[in-house]
Amino acid sequence: MLPSGAPFARAVRIDSIGDDMKFAFVFPGQGSQSVGMLNAFADLAVVRETLQEASDALNQDLGKLIAEGPAEELNLTTNTQPVMLTAAYACYRAWQEAGGPAPSIVAGHSLGEYTALVAAGAIAFKDAVPLVRFRAQAMQTAVPVGQGGMAAILGLDDDTVRAVCAEAAEAGVVEAVNFNAPAQVVIAGNKAAVEKACEIAKAKGAKRALPLPVSAPFHSSLLTPASDQLRDYLATVDVKAPQIPVVNNIDVAVVSDPAAIKDALVRQAAGPVRWVECVRHIAGTGVTHVIECGPGKVLAGLTKRIDANLTGASVFDPASLDEALKLATA
């Protein structure tokens, strides 16, 4: 552990970064949180400052919640969304503090898109924290608890999963909502329709059809009421043109106009996360290294499955930060 307030030791020199290297940063969404996930960074001043800024923005001690839990409270979506934004941004600031190279492009998975916009300078962190708290509340209230569901379908291609959803639609709304990796698609909708889709997927040869422990059918059209509320809230938020290109989830596009950024966030709440396409877009810009900032290492694993030519790493504690920085001199 570092002495309280001590500067973080640089693992590499900035001027040693290879000229042929180009970095992208990606930020995780819900599901990667865990009690104690920032404890290894506890003595890093910039991490403590980030936690304090978030706590001040919500008038809630997020640092204590992250460090001590309980898990049941941490996993409430109204807490998870601001907590994951805060944790991922803290890891990004730790990278900056350590002298890591700046990204040439950024993206985030679902909630992580908000972290990407903060990292790119489009939304102030102090504004983003209450914004994602509101987003969480709107998403949770759009569909009563117990009426919606989500499931991961493994082993079927995208078109087959879409066909499965169409066949199961007689039982209610069910849609493909997260395209996370080749042959890894998440579906969401009415609980009965999701269960029906899982049965059909298995009959069509899916390796697995796993119900997910979530409180709402995130990114499905059932969350349109949440999108409407989010549009009204975003009208009050100051959004600037990003200083770094941000690839959005809903269109797999880089936009700089603040109104277009807000519109993409509104549609994203009730629309699909096209993560495979986002990573391929990033690769198409000449990026060589994709660094995931935040706990869980989920996106680093997906990156390798999407494009084996990309070098991936995660930053979630001092040891992983050192390893990621060493990639810059490899």
In which residue ranges do the predicted regions lie?
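Short, Lys/Arg-enriched N-terminal segments with co-localized hydrophobic residues
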Residues: 7-20
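FabD-like malonyl-/acyl-CoA
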Residues: 17, 21-161, 212, 289-319
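Alpha/beta catalytic cores of group-transfer enzymes, especially the acyltransferase/condensing modules
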Residues: 30-32, 58, 120-272
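Non-catalytic positions within long, well-ordered alpha-helices that form the structural scaffold/packing
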Residues: 96, 202, 283-284
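A short, acidic, amphipathic alpha-helical segment used as a generic capping/interface helix at domain edges
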Residues: 271-287
